[in-house]
Amino acid sequence: SVPSSDEMKKAQLQAQEQERIAWENAIPLGGKSCDVYCFDMALSVGDISDNGIGEQRKNVFKKMLSVCFVEDLDYQVEEKIQKIKTTLTSVIERYVAGEEIRIWYSYNPDELCGMYWLMKQLQPLNCQTTIYLVKLPTWEYGKENTMTSKIAWGEVSPGEWGNYITLQEKAN
């Protein structure tokens, strides 16, 4: 059955209250949202051995985006590549300037490949800057003696990320 408008309103208020409580209990990580970078590159697809974003990655994007974009495919691919290059340049500049990096990853293929790809981009720079790796646990205890499993960091609400900071380890 379809919920009534009163039931919908009640559910929305409950969700908002749960969100408020979650933020009140969140462990701050410091920094700003602009300090967080995402490399949306579908790195679990195709060869990831290129340095930076090369022709192989461009071809993967063309194949993947051709499903959605027909008329302006080349424009969409170039726009995506430029955004990724800008992001990578920013991360490298900050890394070279001595800012620590924290890479959040899991066994999700895109996240795991992304972690390896980014480490490969940073390795030749030979900086002494610390890189921390934070792996999402495969299993964890939930409320009321339950076990939960999350597949990727996208399943973790932003207010919960600080709970995992104790899992960070220095990269070799």
Model feature map: region roles:
Residues 34-41, 126-145, 150-153:
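Conserved beta-strand -> loop -> alpha-helix junction used to position metal-binding or nucleic-acid-contacting
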Residues 2, 47-49, 111-120, 142-148:
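A short acidic (Asp/Glu
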Residues 148-172:
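A conserved mid-domain beta-alpha-beta active-site/ligand-binding segment of alpha/beta enzyme cores
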Residues 114-116, 120-121, 125, 135-136, ...:
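Long, low-complexity intrinsically disordered regions
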Residues 26, 33, 117-131:
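A short alpha->loop->secondary-structure connector
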Residues 67-117:
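Long, hydrophobic/aromatic-enriched structural stretches that serve as scaffold segments
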Residues 1-74:
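A structured, charge-rich N-terminal accessory region that forms the first stable segment of a protein
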Residues 1, 39, 104-108, 134-136:
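Short His-Asn-centered micro-motif
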